[in-house]
Amino acid sequence: MAKKTPAPKTPVASKTAPQAAPKRPTAKEMKQHAQKLPYPAAQADMRLQPDMSFSTYRAAAKLQDKIALVTGADSGIGRAVAVAFAMEGAHVAVLFNENVVDAEETKRLVEAQGRRCILLQSDVRDPEQCKQAVRRTRAELGGLNILVNNAAFQMSQEKFEDIPEEQIRRTFDTNILGYIWMAQAAIPHLQKDDCIINTGSIVGLTGIPILVDYSCTKSAIHALTKSLATYLGPRGIRVNCVVPGPVWTPNIPATMPREEIEKFGYEVALQRAGQPDEIAPAYVLLASADGSFMTGSLVHVTGGKMSSDQ
């Protein structure tokens, strides 16, 4: 049996020494990096690694000793959020479904910041597993202040009529019911000034023909955010949503057509895809006291991918 390729070691982000901004690949440069990977793709297997360097980011202890549970934190945006929270002083529970190697790399990066980290291998489609994840977070890390709903499933299909029923159910069960189950499990333990942050998507506002089912769930997440914000506002618990544009993560080579991968990010004003370490600071804003008067907000981090709902 072939040995599992170890995850490439991501350089540990510096808390206090921002450097020059890295060069980000443009959409025109993506063709040379394009590859197709099987789903679920491991970040460790990507030729062009998503940027997690946080080279221009300066931490300021904005989440000191807070406890965060981040779903889908083994790779991509979720990993970047976990690392950014750790840089700001939080302890992090990393919830993931399948990719142990990637999850262990996230744990290494969190612990490199001097923070505690636990791994929770769970399926957010199962309400009982969501409750168990919250119980373990509270028991092993000492509480829960921040829930980040980020786990997601997508699979592109050229023809809407051909989307299999199994795919549609998995997409909705993961992307919207999973968020609901996690919120239901977490809310009884959240206090004033704690928060929930959901990951939406610009395609939940604009639509996209090859991801119809996924777009529907992201639109539902935006509505869930606003509804929960009104429900939890009287208790001082904030609920917000980060709305990314195209971001370079393992989902792209695993779920998108090759012709889309080869020009990924072409449709935005900045003419390139975002990198995970460019998205994570929005989550820090919403989790920290800097966002204390923000609730029910859809925070666009899209590189200029516009929608009529901005």
Go through the PLM ranges and name each one.
Residues 33, 51-55, 157, 206, ...:
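Short C-terminal tail/terminal secondary-structure segment
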Residues 145, 161-180, 197, 221, ...:
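Catalytic Tyr-X3-Lys loop
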